Design a protein with these regions (language model features):
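Secondary-structure boundary motif
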Residues: 18, 77-78, 133
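Acyltransferase
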Residues: 112-140
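Cysteine-nucleophile active-site neighborhood
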Residues: 1-63, 71-74, 117-119, 123-126
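Short FAD-binding loop at a beta-strand-to-alpha-helix junction that anchors the flavin cofactor
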Residues: 103-109
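Active-site glycine-centered loops adjacent to acidic/histidine catalytic or metal-binding residues
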Residues: 27, 68, 110
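Catalytic beta-strand/loop cores that center a nucleophilic Ser/Cys/Thr
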Residues: 60-102, 140
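Acidic beta-to-alpha connecting loop that harbors the catalytic carboxylate
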Residues: 1, 111-112
């Protein structure tokens, strides 16, 4: 669905951003986090559906499961709050972002799903580390 159709979710995330509570957005959570950070979404001509979507960075490629019809507009050069972490190699859309200052990141796919439930395990381990660090230095 269209993440802009649920402004209350965006407002909730904006409130969480201000509290600096760690956030890991997945799929629509990625889109809502992006909107809360000032990025924009757009409707894909053909949605990303299925189990064979290559995403990655210069050093790492993963095959992911995806099911969405919207994506984030690539205007990261304007928005200095976040940086690009991953792209979708099929169409160059944004597949992952991270906040420059606070413990927030998100991905535009399902790391908990097939093709391999352990392929993206590093994301969950990263989130656990962020929680542990945040707890230690308590932003809360």
């Amino acid at each position: 669905g269209d993440p802009q159709s649920i402004p209350y979710a965006q407002k909730t995330i904006q409130n969480l951003l201000e509290s600096k509570i760690p956030i890991f957005g997945i799929c629509m959570g990625h889109q809502i986090l992006s909107l809360a950070l000032g990025l924009q979404t757009f409707k894909l001509k053909f949605g990303h559906r299925g189990l064979n979507h290559p995403i990655g960075s210069n050093t790492n490629i993963e095959i992911t499961s995806q099911n969405h019809g919207f994506a984030i507009t690539n205007n990261l050069s304007i928005n200095k709050k976040v940086f690009l972490v991953q792209i979708n190699y099929n169409d160059q859309t944004i597949a992952g972002i991270s906040h420059r200052k606070y413990p927030h990141f998100s991905v535009q796919y399902h790391p908990e799903s097939s093709p391999g439930p352990h392929d993206s395990k590093h994301l969950f381990l990263h989130f656990i580390r962020i929680i542990q660090i945040t707890k230690k230095y308590s932003y809360l």
